[in-house]
Amino acid sequence: MRPARRFLAALACVAGALLSACATPTPRAERAVLREVSAQFFLGGRMSASDGNQGASGRIEWQHDTAGDEVTVYSPLGQIAARLISSPTGAELLTSDGQRYQAENAEALMPRVFGFGVPVSRLAHWVQAAPPPGAEVRELDAAGRPALVIDQGWRVDYLEYPDTRARTLPTRVEVSRGDARIRLIIDQWELLQ
């Protein structure tokens, strides 16, 4: 090979190496940990919700199973602010002022709980860091767990896991879309399967 061709070949190799070093790495599928969603769980913790204009915070307890959901939201002083109970036949919201609202499903009542709509069926996946079908995992942490998921216009950030085990459930989750934002600090997890 002539010196000029060797030089061009070497230059092409160096340029290729430099360009690949500048490329944004994408999470490798084989690095991702397969996470299965639990059909039954209980979580307890602290939460805050804001629609950009108004916000509220308090405690939350959520019992989820195949028959439905029971979500109780407590005020910062520990009083029940709202209780949402859903089943395949419908949903009911009871508020601290004695109001009772009914709808076909829990999602229809979420604006009364948080001030904006939230897809409850997908939220059950999100809190477990088990993205539902169609969700895009944009970032993984060092253990191969979701760090950022985009799903139906919602951004789900996993801010903390309690340890480095691959299948550990998250303890800090932030869900947002536009000005709507829910922050969860989960103090208690129970998988009930």
Swiss-Prot record:
GO terms for cellular component: cell outer membrane. It holds the Pfam family LolB. The keyword Membrane applies. It is a lipid-anchor. Gene3D superfamilies: Lipoprotein localisation LolA/LolB/LppX. Residues 1-21 form the signal peptide. GO terms for biological process: lipoprotein localization to outer membrane; protein transport. Keywords: Cell outer membrane, Chaperone, Lipoprotein, Membrane, Palmitate, Protein transport, Signal, Transport. It is found in: Cell outer membrane. A lipid is attached at C22 (S-diacylglycerol cysteine). Its main location: membrane. A lipid is attached at C22 (N-palmitoyl cysteine). Monomer. Plays a critical role in the incorporation of lipoproteins in the outer membrane after they are released by the LolA protein. Belongs to the LolB family. This is Outer-membrane lipoprotein LolB. It comes from Azoarcus sp. (strain BH72). The lineage of its organism: Bacteria, Pseudomonadati, Pseudomonadota, Betaproteobacteria, Rhodocyclales.
